[in-house]
Amino acid sequence: MLNDPEIDIVVNLTIPAVHVEVSEAILAAGKHVWTEKPIGVSRDESLRLLQKADAAGLRVGVAPDTVLGPGVQTAKRAIARGDIGRPLFAQTTFQWQGPEIFHPNPAFLYAKGAGPLLDMGPYYVSALVHVFGPVAAVAALGLQGSPTRTVQVGELAGQEFPVEIPSTLSVLMDFEQGGQAQSLYSTDSPLLRTGIVEITGTEGTIVIPDPNTFGGEITITRPLTQAFVPPAPMTQEVVDVVQEGVLSGRGVGLLDMARSIAADRPHVATGEFGYHVLDTLLSIEEAAESRSFVQVASTIDEVGSLDADFDPFEATL
């Protein structure tokens, strides 16, 4: 594959621990790389990857591209045009029992570079950065529900493996351009509550679809317009936001990168965006360890968007 002159972009779907190693091999072969998230497991190796790509005139794209789907992008446009007023804060939740209940070999999901924060956090942090811009500082508390887990399915069922990372994290985020967020990431909860992204502004609260999907229901709840006097029911206006754009699936980010290369313009899910998300997630880990606020060193100048008329099914290449 790396020696095939007809291949311009290679997709890296390896485990997090070798993301950078494999991506560097792809760059060394003279090809652009689209990598699974996170871009790497450390800042140093991830920055090195971006520097090598820049020196070679090659591009790095980083998942998740779910946030480029009509769900998050429609909500982003609604917020940008002032539909909820000035964004103030966000709340996100991802909690469940853990991937060992369905995955035949889940140990890597509890190893360095994964866990609920590094595995699922990229979806939620990416969505928040699309709305609020770059993250300035974070605080967090973490815990480990159990030092080991047990595989539930497949040939390895019954086998125990170690948990190397916090399995629950409670997170606060402060954004450079204003706004705050609180997030919960957990694989210790029997109660399934995932895909919750709510952003409150001065004139309403918008509910965004699960950032691990490409679309879904979008609603805005308006403030009460008259005094609430019990026992009369408290009724609030809930407005549906029409989702704009063509719904497809994974590969949208890769397609945007390929089209952008052909058109000589920036793609949306850049390596720099992926690095800022990683830097934020690693800062959250450090904040949980120190039980303090940690400044996020990286930033990004501009967060790109996909236009509502982006059609992934159009023949353009």
What are these model-predicted stretches?
Residues 8-9, 89:
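Short, Asp-centered acidic motifs that coordinate Mg2+ and/or phosphate
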Residues 126-217, 251-267, 281-284, 299-317:
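Contiguous beta-strand/loop segments that form the cofactor/metal-binding neighborhood of enzyme cores
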Residues 239, 260-277:
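Glycine- and charged-residue-rich phosphate/anionic-cofactor binding loop of Rossmann-like
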Residues 9, 15-67, 82:
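Beta-strand-loop-alpha-helix segment that lines the small-molecule cofactor/substrate pocket
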Residues 1-7:
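A structured beta-alpha segment of the ubiquitous adenosine-cofactor-binding alpha/beta core
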Residues 6, 14-15, 185:
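Short glycine-/small-residue-rich Rossmann-like dinucleotide-binding loops
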Residues 66-162, 291:
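Predominantly a Rossmann-like dinucleotide-binding segment in NAD(P)-dependent oxidoreductases
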Residues 242-254:
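Active-site loop of classical SDR/Rossmann-like NAD(P)-dependent oxidoreductases
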